[in-house]
Curated annotation (Swiss-Prot):
Enzymatic class: transferase
Similarity comment: family membership: Belongs to the ThiG family.
Location(s), subcellular: Cytoplasm
Taxonomic lineage: Bacteria, Pseudomonadati, Pseudomonadota, Alphaproteobacteria, Hyphomicrobiales
Protein name: Thiazole synthase
Described function: Catalyzes the rearrangement of 1-deoxy-D-xylulose 5-phosphate (DXP) to produce the thiazole phosphate moiety of thiamine. Sulfur is provided by the thiocarboxylate moiety of the carrier protein ThiS. In vitro, sulfur can be provided by H(2)S.
CDD domains: ThiG
Organism: Brucella melitensis biotype 2 (strain ATCC 23457)
Self-association and partners: Homotetramer. Forms heterodimers with either ThiH or ThiS.
Gene that encodes it: thiG
Amino acid sequence: MLEFYGKRFESRLLLGTAQYPSPSILADAVRASLSRIVTVSLRRESGEARAGQDFWALIKALGVAVLPNTAGCHTPREAITTAHMAREVFGTNWIKLEVIGDTDTLQPDPFGLVEAARILCDEGFEVFPYMNDDLIVAERLIEAGCKVLMPWGAPIGSGRGFNNPYALKTMRAHFPDIPLVVDAGIGVPSHAAAAMELGFDAVLINTAVAKAGDPAAMARAFALAVEAGRLAYEADPIEARDMASPSTPLLGKAFL
């Protein structure tokens, strides 16, 4: 069972709530995914108050845990301010911490991320840092107080899967006891299954579901892929070989 900061969940699929064609399609996708955690972005604009109220009513009706994020923040100060606002609005110490360093790739700023994580952890937040796949950055985030890490597979929304599978595999081996969630870049269910087969604890999906032709069907496909990948990992799969190995025994073979 998945566990974050002492809370346990049956599903290992986290779902983002942005970019869906309509609220009803979002709701259908969340239900189809079987996800028990959704990420939400705090809207700092106050213009569409009614739309915001309707959105939160929908999320509450789904009965899922909410993981607010600091999407769009480019400095530690901005991210920290947004985290405080999110705690006030959502009544949770959870925060998915994003400090973006590059506007083209949306690659996280590792220095600003560690700085913000240290401050927020000291203030009692339970931080889920969106990070690259660098082991040293991971070490610094753990030292700062993070008990979950969320390395990217590829740039946000790219659908490329894993740019560096070796780095992700190495991170899993290096931190066997830290919950690891692949966040960003996953495009199709096979990517999610591959992440789970590597031993990752969960995956976070947004664009791949929200922008699909049938979001609910895609959400269901991801749910099945995550379950299959986890079962495969727990089943201890065989090692890849360079040479063939006969699956049919020679015992009893007729020799002519």
